[in-house]
């Protein structure tokens, strides 16, 4: 199993990244909470990973913080939650915010995430509550390990900030109309994609 990668960030297009490790390029999917802590392409990064093998694909998921990976692993063990939905949940809220939902029995916030219906939210509260202590310990002991060593100048990007933000939300399962409306209402002049996506997600929660 691949548990950790240290290499050069080659490309990043939310939620996917490409990391070069000794001449081998690893494609990963990351929750947006981790994705937007990455440096510019050309920098060295360290990410914690979870490897998923399916009949039709082998997928690698990456996380800046160990507690996010721990929560991801707990989520995919919950009934009805696969890697895609777990990634969506962690893109919509941080590990600490998710723990807060468990503590408050906050179904209303959880069901605002795409793919999370009332039954799934209720099931998550029941199944994850017993694991709350270990989640809190992991969250408090989180490690943040990435190194910025870049003099790399990224090539100009054709897509606008709004297009980048909408594309990221669509990849998480939001409907086109929902993503477009959230981005349009949250957009302010001078925002970068990270700020806009965070604001758009916040407006939907």
Curated annotation (Swiss-Prot):
Entry's Gene Ontology BP terms: DNA recombination; DNA repair
Region entry Domain III, spans: 157-205
Location of region: Flexible linker: 144-156
Molecular function (Gene Ontology), one example: four-way junction DNA binding
Region annotation Domain I: where it falls in the sequence: 1-64
Subcellular location: Cytoplasm
Sorted UniProt keywords: Cytoplasm, DNA damage, DNA recombination, DNA repair, DNA-binding
Top-level division of the source organism's lineage: Bacteria
Classification via NCBIfam families: ruvA (TIGR00084)
Protein name according to UniProt: Holliday junction branch migration complex subunit RuvA
Organism of this sequence: Shewanella amazonensis (strain ATCC BAA-1098 / SB2B)
Originating gene: ruvA
């Amino acid at each position: 199993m691949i548990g950790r990668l240290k290499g050069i960030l080659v490309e990043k297009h939310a939620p996917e990244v490409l990391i070069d490790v000794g001449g081998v390029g690893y494609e990963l999917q990351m929750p947006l909470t981790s994705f937007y802590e990455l440096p510019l392409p050309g920098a060295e990064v360290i990410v914690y990973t979870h490897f998923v093998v399916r009949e039709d694909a082998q997928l690698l998921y990456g996380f800046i913080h160990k507690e996010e990976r721990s929560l991801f692993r707990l989520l995919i063990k919950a009934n009805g939650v696969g890697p895609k939905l777990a990634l969506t949940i962690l893109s919509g809220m941080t590990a600490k915010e998710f723990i807060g939902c468990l503590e408050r029995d906050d179904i209303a916030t959880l069901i605002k995430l795409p793919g999370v219906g009332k039954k799934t939210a209720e099931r998550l509260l029941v199944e994850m509550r017993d694991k709350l202590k270990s989640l809190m310990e992991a969250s408090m002991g989180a490690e943040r390990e990435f190194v910025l060593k870049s003099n790399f100048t990224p090539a100009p990007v054709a897509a606008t900030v709004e297009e980048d933000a909408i594309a990221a939300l669509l990849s998480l399962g939001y409907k086109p109309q929902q993503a477009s409306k959230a981005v349009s209402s949250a957009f302010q002049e001078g925002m970068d994609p990270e700020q806009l996506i965070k604001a758009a997600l916040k407006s939907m929660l």
